[in-house]
Every structure is written in C-alpha cells, then in structure tokens.
Design a protein with these regions (language model features):
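A short beta-loop-alpha structural element at the N-terminal edge
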Residues: 10-25
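Conserved GNAT-fold acetyl-CoA-binding loop/helix
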Residues: 31-53
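A short helix-loop-beta-strand connector motif used in the catalytic cores of GNAT acetyltransferases and
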Residues: 48-66, 75
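Conserved beta-strand in the GNAT
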Residues: 64-66, 72-81, 89, 94
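A short, internal acetyl-CoA/4′-phosphopantetheine-binding micro-motif in the GNAT/acyltransferase core
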Residues: 93-100, 126-128
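Conserved acetyl-CoA-binding loop-helix of GNAT-fold acetyltransferases
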Residues: 95, 101-114, 139
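Conserved GNAT acetyl-CoA-binding A-motif
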Residues: 114-128
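Conserved catalytic-core motifs of GNAT/GCN5-like acyltransferases
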Residues: 125-127, 139-163
Length: 164
C-alpha cells in the first residue's frame, strides 16, 4: 500500500528537442479531458491545435519544461520570458491524467515563480468552461481576471478556443 502522505517534491526539467513531439501529444491528451467532459467529444481535432502549440514553442523567450514529482514526469509547462520588460506569460501548464489533485500544479507554479523572481507581471489564459483552472489560477496562484473572451467577446487576433 502506498503512503499518500509522502510529500511531492516538484521540480522543472528542460524539455529536449527530441522530446517535443511526445510533450505536445501529452499536453493535447491532458487538455482534451476537460473538452470531452464539457462537450462530449473533440470533433475539431486536437486541443490545443498543433499550430497553437508550435507557435508557443517557437515564441520569443519560450522555455519548455517537464514537471517532475519526486523525479517522475507528471506534466509540463511552457512559459515565455521577456528579459527586457519582465512581463512574462504562462502559455501552457498541464498535469497528466490521473496525476492531479496532489498539489503538484500549485507547487509547479511556485517553482516557476522562484525560477523567474524578476517577473513584474505574469499573464495566462484558460477557457471559460475550465472552472477548475479558473479556481486554480485565481484562488490558489493569485492571478486576477482582467479580460473575458468568448464567442460573443473574442480576441480578433486569435482563433477561437473550444468553449471560448
């Protein structure tokens, strides 16, 4: 029997070039769970799209990490760091299916903040139907909601997100 009281030690490890394909697929699998729960299926292709992920991977200042809990890969994170302005972006954060609910997400966020202490502003986004994510970012991590986008109120510079 496993001891559920063992503390998770969360660390970040840079993703290697030859790991990007699997990282992308793991990210899409993780994100698809909420879409299927909300809408019943993922009809429009992988969520997020390959193009959206590649755009994030190739953005200026992009840094891609595996999330490790006690040395085992349990998820990943993509951040974009602007060394000049220190207005940085959390582009993707995911915990693999079955690995959540153990404080790993919050410990990951704290590890990111520790890694980038000069950051003045962090920005992120999540679909409106992702109530767990909204709770996590606002109530656990301290983000503030400054903009609400949906089909009715969207960002003309970006393609629509499912449910957003």
């Amino acid at each position: 029997m496993k001891d559920n009281n063992i503390e998770n030690i969360v660390t970040l490890e840079l993703v290697k070039e030859d790991e990007l394909y699997k990282f992308k697929k793991d990210l899409q699998e993780s994100f698809s769970v909420a879409v299927i729960e909300e809408f019943g299926s993922v009809d429009a292709g992988p969520i997020p799209s390959d193009e959206e992920i590649e755009k994030s991977f190739n953005a200026p200042g992009a840094v891609i990490y595996h999330i490790l809990s006690n040395g085992i890969k349990v998820g990943g994170v993509v951040v974009s760091i602007n060394e000049e302005t220190q207005h940085n972006s959390l582009d993707f954060l995911f915990i693999a299916k079955g690995k959540g609910g153990k404080g790993i997400g919050y410990k990951t966020w704290k590890a990111i903040e520790e890694k980038y202490p000069e950051t003045k502003v962090w920005e992120t986004h999540t679909p409106f139907f992702e109530k767990r994510n909204i709770h996590f970012y606002v109530n656990k991590c301290g983000f503030k909601i400054v903009e609400y986008l949906s089909e009715k109120y969207n960002n003309p510079d970006e393609e629509g997100l499912p449910g957003g």
